[in-house]
Amino acid sequence: YATRYIAMEYHKRDFDKANSYVSSAFYGDTIIASVILAIGVIFVLFIERFLNISPELIVSVKLLFLLVFVNFFFTTIQTVFNSTSYIKNRLDITGLVRVVGYIVEIILYLAIFKLFPPQVWYVGIVMLVVTAINFLAAIWMFHNMTPELKVERKLFSVDAVKKLVGNGIWNSINSLGITLNSGLD
């Protein structure tokens, strides 16, 4: 949801305000993702108390869940960097990167399951590699296509976070309402 505000200020050429949204969204997302990652690590440590897992699969399942939470962390903090493709109307580049990610994903699954004995945590490794490709591409686009935008701690604004969270929550509630309403048809 931050992309909307970043793009509006960017196109108004108010780079100070755009950078305030960029920095606030980045640090806000990082804080949220870090808290969820910490909770996820605690969950992983005690996963057998929450889920019924065969003893021989516990380590593999723990690794998978840990990799899923790490993947979530990077996907979440990547969000602000993805705004560049919308700002510059270059969704084609993002689409191309996703296609490359899908191809890498297929190749990795085929290679890993051909070369090694099957393990459930391989799925987490492949997810993390694909996320790394998307993450690096988003950062490259951000720095090269929108050099006016920067993530700086001094530009973090609690007011900007409140605005983004407030509108984001309202948007989420609205989307939930639409989903529930369309599900009742």
Question: What label would you give each PLM region?
Answer:
Residues 1-12, 26, 87, 146-148:
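Helix-loop junctions and terminal segments of transmembrane helices
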Residues 13-23, 34-68, 115-125, 151:
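Membrane-interface helix-capping segments at transmembrane helix termini in multi-pass transporters
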Residues 24, 33, 72, 101-106, ...:
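Residue-level recognition of pore/gate-forming positions within transmembrane alpha-helices
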Residues 29, 33, 64-68, 72, ...:
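Residue-level signature of transmembrane alpha-helical cores of multipass secondary-active transporters
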Residues 42-45, 55-78, 107, 132-133, ...:
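Alpha-helical transmembrane segments of multi-pass membrane proteins
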Residues 73-97, 110, 121:
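Membrane-interface junctions at transmembrane-helix termini in multi-pass inner-membrane proteins
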Residues 89-92, 103-136, 140, 144:
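Membrane-interface helix-loop junctions in multi-pass transport and translocation proteins
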Residues 120-124, 138-183:
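Interhelical loop/hinge segments that connect adjacent transmembrane helices in multipass membrane
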